[in-house]
Swiss-Prot record:
Residues 146-165, 188-210, 484-538 are annotated as: Disordered. Residues 291-474 are annotated as: IF-3 like. This is Translation initiation factor IF-3, chloroplastic. Residues 493-530 have a biased composition (Acidic residues). Gene3D superfamilies: Translation initiation factor 3 (IF-3), C-terminal domain, Translation initiation factor 3 (IF-3), N-terminal domain. Residues 1-140 form a transit peptide. Involved in chloroplast protein synthesis. It enhances the poly(A,U,G)-dependent binding of the initiator tRNA to chloroplast 30S subunits. GO terms for biological process: ribosome disassembly. NCBIfam families: infC.
Amino acid sequence: MVRSSCLQCDQPSQGSNSTFGCGGPLAAVCATGLLVLVLYSPSSQTANWSAQGISTKALYPAVPVPSTLLPGSAPAKHQLHVWRAHAMSEATTNNSFKQSLFGYNAISSIWLQLAGVAATFFAFGALMAAVTQRKEIAVFSASGQAAEPEGAEPLKRPFPSPAAKPKPLFSTPANSFSNIFQAPPSLRTDSTYGRGPRSTSFTDISNWPSNNALRNPQSVIDIGGGVDFLGDRSPGNPFTRLRGSPSSTLSNLGMGLGLGLGKGKGFGKGFGKGRGFPVEEEVEEEQEVLSWADRRRALADPDAPPMNEDIKYPQLRLVRAVPGGRDEKLGVMSRQEALELAEAEDIDLVLVSIDTDPPVAKLVNYSKLKYESEKKKKDSHKKGKVKEVKELKVSHKIGQHDYDVRVKQARKFLEGGHRIKVSMEFKGRENQFVEIGRAVMKRFQNDLADMGKADAVPKKLGTRLILNLAPAGEALKVIAERRAERDRKAAAEEEGEGDDLDFVDENEDEDVEGEGEEEEAEELEEETAEGTEVPTRS
């Protein structure tokens, strides 16, 4: 059984003939428009003229009327319209339009016809809107057959009052998605539509009936029901759709939640295919608890070899580090025995090689072992490092201050064991001052005679004058002293003078090697590489 009510007045339809509810006035407007069209149609107006004895010549005296278009000849409607337009145009041209307009209300019939057409279309559109918004409630039994419950109350409007009606979520028909997040009537405890019930939790929602039980709609346009974008009929429960099955809590929120929540696919296909919020159980993973020493060692050296408890081999070939470079062999023993021996001697058990069977482990202070390996790498790097040739650019018109800076830089380079190339460039008419440049070069060589030795006299190569200097004299003595100082400190470290090698200052070692002075000299070279040119007196 189907009962109807009006969306505008909150009252049920009266009787079986009252189909449209508040659409009755609209039907009256539609009928009025149709009546206007009938009364003021061209054929009825022509018959009216004939009944009153009015001839068309009296209406339009300036226009000859064909006999085929006179009243009573039943001309075709389109021919009469063509003649009427032509007659009005001629009457306007002959200044007889006033007579035709005020002598007889002929033009008013056209206005009434247009008004009737507009009223008819308006009434028809409003009537269709009323039919579309008509609310039909179908109550289905468990078997799917319609049944009207006894004592059913008249249908209530979905909103208590127009003021309480919430703003639609989307600009779609009122029967589609305006109440998309409302809970089904069985769980609704709040009278206000447009939001979920206050007393319903997610646990209760997860216990709703399955999707198969909701294939028969409880309501066509009730909360979230209606027709989706694909033309499928949606059930009254907005959290369950006709297709698919609920996966978890809030599995299908009507429009699929295609905005990125859950696994919705967006608005492209009927508001997507919402798969909801999968409930994932949080599993606490057991994390290995490291001691403070192990954490400190791991942070200090992430590339450290396996040592102490990290060694998992059951049998080990054990050796002990002995000062002097030779290792003492202790034989094969179990992992537990090796760990106990390392703990007794307060040193580390480091896995050295896994190529043998059993693997080789060494009892050694790992910090000292790491320091020695890094030191060997530095020594090999120094032996293979080629001393660079430092170039100093001067000018034949260099000032005294800039000259002193260049000499100071040259001394530091020579003390560091570097060769020096002093260059002086001549451009254009400056070639006439080559002899002045040679004098500057000779002066430069004499001021550095105690530190460096020139390979040859200054040579002119292209546009440049070149002077090469090699360390000699005092520079060689300084180099020898620095080398002896480094050897002395290295021997002291090997003898075990530094027990706490975890906190060795690497910068100190770099300063001892003289690299700090070289960097300072390079900075000075960059600052004054070009020099300040002082114009010479002519």
